């Protein structure tokens, strides 16, 4: 059927574009593939000489959750906050880039030695990226705006700016300004998450770890504790990565005008492993709260 449709379109001066399942067929070289089931279909297509639009659902779908599901309107499932989208490599032309993408697609560390990537001859076949929105759980225009903005700005920038020239903290500063501008224009943009993300990189043979705290808000007053207590306005103010002993419990929260915003985040620094943010939530929307936005 796919080959019949492709032949019909070609006879009428048209080019077929289809989801990556079409790679199972004997396609003409003129067909274009949309890679939505991760990145592997796009990598295969580009290396086989087909034009590709990169649109991995695990990263570039706007109908996925963008913050703690219990604080958000019901969505399709999954988790794609703005930083996750911003870190995507549209042209995974090295093992390291492909592994970075695969790690956030799978929600776990993936070694560069275990992934396919786009070879030199295939890079020019990646013609763009696409963010997708499916509306099973989106009932109003305002809800649609809430799901798309400001994540659409991250997708736009990753499309025209190489990954090595993108810097999260610079983008974070700018995106907070743009959220205010969107609201001023009557667009119901998501105001960005108040959650604090804690990551830990093990040092000294597992005896210590470098801890990083991050939030989407800017400027941000993030306070933390290392003694098991909840952060309060007088707790240590985060001003950059710090080192702790393995076995330490880090608790952190965002504060605005002396009050905690959002919820407290907690991480036990395990001596056996790094703790990275791979943006994982269960893909079961029925367990999540459904609230109006």
Describe the function of each predicted region.
Residues 1-50:
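Active-site neighborhood of glycoside hydrolase catalytic domains
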Residues 9, 33, 152, 224, ...:
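Hydrophobic, well-ordered secondary-structure elements that form the walls
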Residues 10-20, 52-56, 162-168, 190-191, ...:
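Acidic/polar loop patches that form or flank catalytic/metal-binding clefts of enzymes
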Residues 17-21, 34-36, 53-55, 132, ...:
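Generic beta-strand/beta-sheet core signal
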Residues 20-30, 61-65, 86-92, 128-135:
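Active-site clefts of carbohydrate-active enzymes
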Residues 27, 63-71, 141-145:
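Histidine/acidic-residue-rich catalytic or RNA/ligand-binding cores of hydrolases
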Residues 72-207, 216-220:
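Substrate-binding clefts and catalytic carboxylate motifs of secreted carbohydrate-active enzymes
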Residues 166-293:
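Short, compositionally stereotyped local motifs that mark structural "simplifiers"
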């Amino acid at each position: 059927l796919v080959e019949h449709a492709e032949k019909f379109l070609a006879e009428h001066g048209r080019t077929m574009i289809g989801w990556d399942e079409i790679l199972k067929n004997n396609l003409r070289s003129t067909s274009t593939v949309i890679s939505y089931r991760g990145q592997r279909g796009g990598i295969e297509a580009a290396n086989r000489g087909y034009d590709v639009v990169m649109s991995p659902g695990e990263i570039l779908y706007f109908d996925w959750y963008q913050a703690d599901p219990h604080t958000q309107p019901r969505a399709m499932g999954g988790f794609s906050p703005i930083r996750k989208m911003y870190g995507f490599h549209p042209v995974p032309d090295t093992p390291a880039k492909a592994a970075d993408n695969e790690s956030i697609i799978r929600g776990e560390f993936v070694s560069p030695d275990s992934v396919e990537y786009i070879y030199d001859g295939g890079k020019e076949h990646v013609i763009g990226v696409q963010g997708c929105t499916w509306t099973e759980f989106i009932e109003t225009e305002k809800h649609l705006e809430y799901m798309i903005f400001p994540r659409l700005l991250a997708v736009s920038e990753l499309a025209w700016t190489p990954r090595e020239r993108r810097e999260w903290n610079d983008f974070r500063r700018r995106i907070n300004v743009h959220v205010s501008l969107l609201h001023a224009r009557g667009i119901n943009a998501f105001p960005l998450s108040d959650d604090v993300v804690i990551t830990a990189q093990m040092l000294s043979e597992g005896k210590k770890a470098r801890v990083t705290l991050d939030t989407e808000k800017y400027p941000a007053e993030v306070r933390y504790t290392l003694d098991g207590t909840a952060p309060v306005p007088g707790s240590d103010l985060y001003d950059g990565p710090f080192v702790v002993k393995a076995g330490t419990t880090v608790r952190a929260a965002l504060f605005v005008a002396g009050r905690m915003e959002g919820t407290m985040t907690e991480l036990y620094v395990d001596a056996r492993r790094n703790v990275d943010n791979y943006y994982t939530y269960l893909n079961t929307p029925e367990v999540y709260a459904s609230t109006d936005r």
